């Protein structure tokens, strides 16, 4: 690990004092703990021999780091690999959200906090998860599809693109790009790319982001502001700015003393929550919760106007920063041994994170309304002469709660309560995923979608099923050809691992065509000798995945499960 920057050490000493600074620096040189969060929507139980994360119901510390890439349950969305401090966001949501809401996760990739809040939002809530960077928005969509909750929309937009959605969100989470000091021990590049100039760039950009999105928050709505850095400029100073300039009230969150959370370090009289690695078992995190006062004026924003935005973009001299996936691996399965070339995080100060807003606005009308390039959903497009395949409605539970439609060559199901809002979003945003993609038209055949296989409302009995061995499951996840038992019927078959759905194949008898998404496949042909899977000693997993009372160590019921 490289030496910590001397400027960072000095600013930290001034903020925390000599003893705390020294303790923090020692902690940043130590190994980080390994933690996961289980998916209550898929009835995932507590892992055996794991230790609970105290500030969330379904987070657990593991005794050792499994080879997550080679665990089929990881790819099935049965759990998410997430550092423990980040799970505190759920505590804030539970404290202030007790009815169905519309929530925006503005800077959401790779999706850890989105999957977290989706499981603790009340049933009937809608989550809009957004990421500005194109490549990272695809990662976000992948993780949320695997998580399986249908009350989710994924978008790929700059915060300024939400300007038409005035006062439409009850809750907004802004896990803003930052200087990444809290990630120093996870990635050496965070250290080598840190600078005091970068810190200044970040706090200015963070204010621009909050100012852009503030009009979208309802009167009385909740803004959750978070960073993964330690300095006061990006944390307490920005919270004070939001309160004074935008007319916000800073709110408390319930905590326990034994959790080791640190409060405000600047002496100001408002509650904030700092996770410092020498006091809490996790990475660095800062959280503040603010309420938009009813009838408050928007204020004179410091970061509006096209000239200011251009100057901000031109001021990104360092080009530093990166994006760490919280789990150290990409969702497509690149392992610690084979990291992808671009494993950088929204939290740092890469120049590309928030490009010139004027340019984006110019593209929005033409590009975003058309759905843009790639995999964005097309606005109202239909295949001529093709009607909705009614048989697909039987593929999901509670079909009466959904609005069914054809878009391009896809049959999709949108939660009925939010169908109108979805149509409104398509007018101004680039939507990558919404609801459930049930099937795709291939010739004259409606092929069941992988999104359907991952969904928590999949009706498994609508398809023949076959449970794969570990070797077969890894072959399937590598998108290799597999051969099923002769007793398995021909046609579309749902393949499972330990009775948890992995996806579909089309069984031809002599072989099965692998329908796993090409871009999500495990690229590594290497399989470690020791995998140490999360659930290796839990033989009753089949009962858990079916929601049986026989499931050992069940988790508390989730309101959105």
Q: What residue ranges belong to the model's regions?
A:
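Glycine-rich nucleotide cofactor-binding entry segment
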Residues: 1-168, 200-205, 249-275, 393, ...
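Helix-to-beta-strand junctions that scaffold the AdoMet/dcAdoMet cofactor pocket
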Residues: 122, 217-219
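Polybasic, low-complexity RNA-engagement segments
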Residues: 1-46, 293-561
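Mobile active-site "lid"/loop adjacent to the S-adenosyl-L-methionine
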Residues: 135, 170-212, 224, 228-235, ...
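A short hydrophobic/small-residue beta-strand
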Residues: 127, 223-224
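Core SAM-dependent methyltransferase catalytic element
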Residues: 269-306
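Conserved proline-anchored active-site loop of SAM-dependent methyltransferases
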Residues: 103-113, 169-188, 285, 499
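A structural alpha-helix within SAM-dependent methyltransferase catalytic domains
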Residues: 118, 207-214, 240-243
